[in-house]
């Protein structure tokens, strides 16, 4: 005869079996989508990172193209470029459609010192300069960029959790496509005491934070996708006396095809950027 206690144990076991369906695959869905990864694709270095909180799909296309689509909670950043980075004229084109907090930027890292840097070309509803320290401005590639510095304490980095500075150049007229002359920003940062170290990777990146959106970006450069040379400084032009006898202030234009203003610098030296533009840095 089965005891009452044994009957209750058997009934409880049957109840547990009936409570959970045999097919419970819905519990195993990976909401993060594409996992974090780095590597090469189409002759370019790529980096994609996510904290796993968002629904995100990152896809490498041919050559310098990549596509990114995301939504939901979480942080993610991905794109194509070079490893190591360097001072070069980076070209990019495509589409960028953010909804919320997101950046489209030339993005990278250096070590010794550990620096995370952004040249922000476009952004969503949140201005990345919020709460940052304004250091100055630089004129490059047809626009003014405001320069900021922030510090990150015990945050994720390319060497693990660390404390480091972030350098920002934020374009004041948003765009999606054009040329980013990285050396102009590196030189301007240096002139402001914002020193960089040894270059790690450098990409044209899309970043999203608790937001949604999509991007389809193609990256290139004047030196080709495979270039990974050492950082170089722009040539220096010798100062000359201006027609009016007054030299330009720091960050002002001091040369270029068709330029008729002052060709000397009261502060800094006249640095050549391209045939159309030189600047006091």
Curated annotation (Swiss-Prot):
One Pfam family of this protein, by short name?
Answer: Glyco_hydro_11
**Domain (GH11): residue spans on this chain:** 32-220
Recorded GO cellular component terms are: extracellular region
Q: Which reaction does it catalyse?
A: Endohydrolysis of (1->4)-beta-D-xylosidic linkages in xylans
Tell me the leader sequence span: 1-19
Query: Known PANTHER family for this protein?
Result: ENDO-1,4-BETA-XYLANASE A-RELATED
**What is the name of the protein in this document?**
Ethylene-inducing xylanase 1
Where does this protein come from, organism-wise? Botryotinia fuckeliana (strain B05.10)
Q: Which gene encodes it?
A: EIX1
């Amino acid at each position: 005869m089965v005891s009452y206690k044994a009957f209750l144990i058997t009934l409880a076991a049957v109840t547990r079996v009936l409570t959970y369906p045999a097919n419970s695959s819905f519990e195993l869905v990976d909401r993060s989508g594409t996992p974090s990864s780095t590597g090469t694709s189409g002759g370019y270095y790529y980096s994609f990172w996510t904290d796993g909180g968002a629904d995100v799909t990152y896809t490498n296309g041919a050559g310098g193209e990549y596509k990114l689509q995301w939504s939901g909670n979480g942080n993610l950043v991905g794109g194509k470029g070079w490893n190591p980075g360097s001072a070069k004229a980076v070209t990019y084109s495509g589409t960028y459609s953010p909804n919320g907090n997101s950046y489209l930027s030339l993005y990278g890292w250096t070590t010794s010192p550990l620096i995370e840097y952004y040249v922000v070309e476009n952004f969503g509803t949140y201005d990345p300069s919020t709460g940052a320290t304004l250091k100055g401005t630089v004129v490059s590639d047809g626009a003014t960029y405001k320069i900021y510095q922030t510090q990150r304490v015990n945050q994720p980095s390319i060497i693990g959790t660390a404390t480091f500075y972030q350098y920002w150049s934020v374009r004041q007229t948003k765009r999606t496509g054009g040329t980013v002359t990285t050396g102009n920003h590196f030189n301007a940062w240096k002139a402001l005491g914002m020193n960089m170290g040894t270059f790690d990777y450098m990409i044209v990146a899309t970043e999203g934070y608790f937001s949604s959106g999509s991007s389809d970006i193609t990256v290139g450069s004047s030196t080709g996708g495979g270039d990974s040379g050492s950082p170089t400084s722009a040539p220096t032009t010798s100062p000359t006396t201006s027609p009016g006898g007054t030299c330009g202030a720091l960050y002002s234009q001091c040369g270029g095809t068709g330029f008729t203003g002052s060709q000397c610098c009261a502060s800094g030296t006249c640095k050549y950027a391209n045939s159309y533009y030189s600047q006091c840095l």
